């Protein structure tokens, strides 16, 4: 084996070619890094592309690059390490350890056999880290062991910026059960140290944004948010990521711009325009709808929601159904357009998670109350479930409980039981405020403090309404309905 040492070179990696390494007239830019790995110089260049794509969460493209590296140099051991990691999407809660283990098996059937293929102590340490990640134990246990291994690599090789970046990502990953600010700030601090050395490192920019994408810490992420899309414009996810910070700060115009670019880029990259949208396009479109609604651009939001409706009618899979449910709920709550034809589109819940069923049944319950259908509202309330108290730090896990209380409160109000209604909504608002804020569009789709504030407004209790609109805005900065309500309460 030949060793290609690039320790003195910061590669501004601009490649000619598609993710499959075929020639193409379009230059692709994914950022810059410097990573020493054993193998031929030609294969090393393609490996670096895969590494940068991996930091950008362009997993399919990264896998193609790592496979192309192996084709150029079958002994390029780190290319197998990279390929194995393309099946692990930690922040998306998507895991395929069997696929990763199959990649490792290409190197050998045992950890000892595989280690023999990695020529340096440092490269062996990288292998050992994923042996922990894809070894025995449940997902959380393996993630903790993996993070510890990356921490050891980072400590042993402090000049290895990619080790630092992957360690930062692992700290975000092990925040199980909800956002742990201590872990997130540790990750952010590591990312900042990388950016001081290499301000064009895509992993540092990317993981910095994830570390800070809550309303409290978002100002710390503005540098990365503004720069990331410039550094890695060929990565669809990089085009989107800045909006994590913009949403947390209520910067809706920038959020609209970034998600428009990301959505259009994702669709343009589809080999067949008639194929269903991929995850990147779906994600950007959902966020775009929310950003448009926060600017009062409900007609434009409806046009984008119609794209999800079209996907639902043409394909109807789990992905299409859950995307339509979430986007429809967001649109109806934010626009208050309860007479919209979107409200009547049927969706099959088979195979969908409790989160999406609860979200849609909440909407069905509100629609029933809008038409004075008490029995319909009761049916929806039962379908939401969430009747029992829950202890969790995760907003998403808490959603059924929050929406159960919110709908029950509205049902009590409709029945004239004002005291009961307020008690239920206050319980929901207090419960929601007890957990860290979520990034992106509002979770739950109806912020419960906003609902409580709306109720106080309807009762003429303007000071209590003001207090609760302000509470809602703490976790949903710049949210239009809360801002409008707050202005009304003040006057």
PLM segments and residue spans:
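Amphipathic alpha-helical repeat scaffolds of TPR domains
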Residues: 40-49, 75-87, 115-137, 159-176, ...
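A conserved hydrophobic secondary-structure block that centers on an alpha-helix together
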Residues: 57-60, 136-239
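Inter-helical turn/loop elements of alpha-helical hairpins
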Residues: 58-64, 83-120, 128-141, 174-182, ...
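Short, charge-rich amphipathic alpha-helical segments embedded
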Residues: 64-97, 156-165, 201, 317-318, ...
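Solenoid-like repeat scaffolds
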Residues: 70-72, 154-156, 195-197, 226-234, ...
């Amino acid at each position: 084996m030949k060793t290609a040492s690039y320790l003195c070179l910061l590669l501004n990696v601009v490649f000619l070619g598609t993710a499959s390494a075929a020639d193409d007239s379009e230059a692709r830019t994914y950022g810059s890094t410097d990573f020493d790995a054993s193998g031929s110089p030609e294969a090393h260049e393609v490996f670096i592309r895969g590494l940068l794509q991996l930091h950008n969460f362009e997993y399919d493209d990264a896998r193609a690059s790592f496979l192309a590296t192996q084709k150029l140099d079958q002994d390029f051991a780190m290319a197998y390490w990279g390929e194995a990691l393309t099946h692990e999407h930690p922040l998306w809660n998507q895991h395929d350890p069997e696929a990763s283990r199959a990649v490792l098996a290409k190197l050998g059937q045992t950890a000892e056999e595989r280690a023999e293929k990695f020529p340096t102590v440092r490269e062996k340490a990288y292998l050992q880290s994923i042996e922990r990640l894809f070894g025995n134990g449940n997902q959380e246990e393996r993630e903790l062991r993996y993070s510890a291994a990356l921490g050891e690599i980072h400590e042993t090789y402090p000049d290895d910026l990619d080790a630092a970046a992957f360690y930062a990502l692992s700290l975000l990953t092990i925040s199980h059960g909800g956002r742990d600010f201590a872990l997130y700030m540790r990750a952010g601090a590591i990312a900042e140290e990388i950016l001081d050395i290499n301000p064009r490192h895509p992993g540092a920019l990317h993981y910095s944004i994830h570390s800070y994408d809550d309303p409290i810490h978002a100002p710390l992420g503005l540098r990365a948010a503004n720069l990331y899309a410039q550094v890695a414009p060929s990565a669809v996810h990089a085009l989107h990521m800045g909006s994590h910070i913009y949403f947390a700060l209520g910067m809706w115009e920038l959020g609209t711009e970034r998600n428009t670019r990301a959505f259009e880029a994702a669709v343009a990259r589809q080999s067949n325009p008639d194929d269903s949208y991929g995850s990147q396009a779906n994600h950007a479109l959902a966020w775009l709808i929310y950003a448009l609604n926060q600017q009062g651009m409900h007609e434009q939001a409806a046009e984008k929601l119609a794209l999800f409706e079209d996907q639902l009618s043409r394909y109807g899979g789990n992905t299409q159904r859950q995307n339509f449910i979430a986007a429809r709920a967001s649109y109806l709550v934010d626009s208050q357009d309860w007479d919209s034809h979107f409200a009547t589109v049927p969706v099959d819940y088979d195979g969908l998670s409790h989160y999406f069923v609860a979200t849609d049944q909440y909407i069905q319950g509100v629609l029933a109350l809008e038409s004075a259908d008490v029995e319909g509202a009761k049916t929806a309330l039962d379908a939401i479930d969430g009747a029992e108290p829950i202890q969790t730090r995760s907003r998403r896990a808490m959603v059924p409980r929050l929406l159960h209380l919110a709908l029950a409160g509205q049902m009590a109000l409709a029945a004239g039981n004002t005291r009961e209604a307020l008690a239920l909504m206050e319980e929901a608002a207090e419960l929601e405020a007890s957990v860290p804020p979520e990034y992106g569009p509002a979770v739950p789709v109806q912020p419960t403090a906003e609902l409580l504030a709306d109720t106080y407004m309807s009762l003429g209790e303007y000071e209590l309404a003001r207090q609760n609109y302000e509470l809602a805005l703490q976790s949903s900065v710049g949210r239009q309905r809360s801002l409008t309500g707050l202005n009304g309460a003040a006057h």
